[in-house]
Amino acid sequence: MMLQVYSAANLLWILCNSAVINFCQFVLWLLVRPLDGALYRRLMGSLVQALWVDVAATCFPDAKLVVTGEVPKDTARPVIIIANHQVDADWWYIWQGNIKIVLKDQLKYVPIIGWGMRLFEFLFLRRSIDHDSAHIKAYMDSLIGDDYPFWLVIFPEGTTIHQEYVAKSQAFAEKLNRPKFERVLLPRTSGLQIILDAVADVKPDIYDLTLAFPTYSGEVPTFEMGYSRKIDTSVPSMKSLLAGQGPPHVAIHAKKYSYDAATQNLEQFLDARWQEKEERLNYFIAHQKFPVQKDEDVSVLTLPSSIFSVFKLWFGMTMSFFLLPVVMMSFFPLYTVWVVYCFVYSVYDRTTNFWWPYIFNLFLERAGKTRDGLASKK
């Protein structure tokens, strides 16, 4: 009972603070985005999204990230991250300020949390090639056009691992003569292929992440078990994190690949990477760590969590309550004066170079031509 109360309190805490985040997002969307879309994106990522991560972390148990391999260091360069998808909480250990995550379209309709992810410009897909192709192209063109250093996370497996999905994955792989796996699901290529085609102009680096949790033994849950495990109880879920239960550390292995290496034959590339994941996870089961080569780095990172971030969030909202009305009360009178001026100017001077009177005059001219045309027909 106490655990349920604690979980409910944590969820309420996250929702309340997320609602405040929504307000801050709305303020930026209203005041900054119309003036400078690129600045809006950078503020939303480096300030608001990073703050949301910090605030949410106050509810979850502390965890260290033991990162082996090639750790991304150039934060100004676009990156595409591919990863295995063990459970519904693994994205939490990847999420940072400028990261965009590819998610199911239905999630954007979740109240408060979904609204926030939508304003953070996560990439929502319907799993419809016709819709997703055009949507991804427009989405990536917009990020590239603003020179935004996005880190886009995609889980090519498309869903979390369960025994029923493993059986379907293996049957599908056998039909296509592709490798069959036990620890991971066969990766899908269509969504990632569209994304790679859309970012061909910038050729981002590709980072392959493999995640594993302490005491992981390879247990795969059934649909009935959901995200819980009977043996690998240290594998977290969002439910367990809300209850304050989570692993003390998470193992992440990162390996960097060039854009050209991935695009030459994406299916073969993903099959090779997932075969490596299978072997890497088997090694982890035996040794409780990932293998490290001599030229690879080992870094221990701590997830940010500070009650001061909550103070910053609420202070920012309080200031916004005072500043937003002032800005709006200043904006609308000035806008009204400008519209009246443009109207008067357009009436007495038809040679103006101002854009608003020009459009107004153009509208009057076309209306006059239409009226004259109708009169001549009569």
Predicted regions and their residues:
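Charge-dense, low-complexity intrinsically disordered segments
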Residues: 42, 46, 130, 182, ...
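Catalytic lobes of large eukaryotic enzymes
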Residues: 148, 173-313, 345, 349, ...
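Soluble catalytic domains of membrane acyltransferases
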Residues: 59-232
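Short, solvent-exposed helix-helix connector turns and helix-capping sites enriched
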Residues: 32-37, 129, 177, 331-332
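Generic structural motif
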Residues: 26, 70, 106, 157, ...
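Membrane-anchoring hydrophobic helices of lipid-metabolizing enzymes
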Residues: 1-79, 93
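Alpha-helical bilayer-embedded segments of polytopic membrane proteins, i.e.
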Residues: 1-22, 299-356
